[in-house]
Amino acid sequence: MINVEIVRHYNKWREHKQINKSLIKKITQNILLRFDNFSKIKQFELSILLTNAAEILILNKQFRNIEKATNVLSFPSNELNWQDLYSKLEFLGDSDYMHLGDIAFCYEVIYNESCEQHKTFENHFIHLLIHSILHLIGFDHQNDTEANIMENLEIEILSYFGIFPPY
């Protein structure tokens, strides 16, 4: 089971009814089912903040020391490495619960990017959600090899949901 908490700090998000707990759960589940080691976990939790440029700028400055609004920020609850997902998740011990982390999305940046890239707002959000969840479970793009692995997985998941790959 995946429990999703959504907090909306910006009313423009309400215009996008398709962006809801059901969608987020479906995408999260699709990602987690790709890794056998997550099968022993019975309950996952994920927190989503849907906010605006002013708030994301504060968060980006506070946590990354970057004074600029960004499309999305991911805050993993666990220090995972994607390579460990194929072996045992020993840090969980006997627990069958895992808080994946928190993700903050910025409406204005996502809106502007979707217009510039000729995508629907929802499809761009889905791509960023996939990207963020992959960060929460230990994927990164600090070098070309990691970036290729992460991008290929994003493309595979986006294709599953009928969304044209952005790369």
From Swiss-Prot:
Enzyme Commission (EC) number: 3.1.-.-
Main location: cytoplasm
Residues at which Zn(2+) binds: H131, H135, H141
A GO MF label: metalloendopeptidase activity
Keywords, alphabetical: Cytoplasm, Endonuclease, Hydrolase, Metal-binding, Nuclease, Ribosome biogenesis, rRNA processing, Zinc
Entry cofactors: Zn(2+)
Cellular component annotations (GO), alphabetically ordered: cytoplasm
Major enzyme class: hydrolase
Location in or out of the cell: Cytoplasm
Protein name, UniProt field: Endoribonuclease YbeY
Gene: ybeY
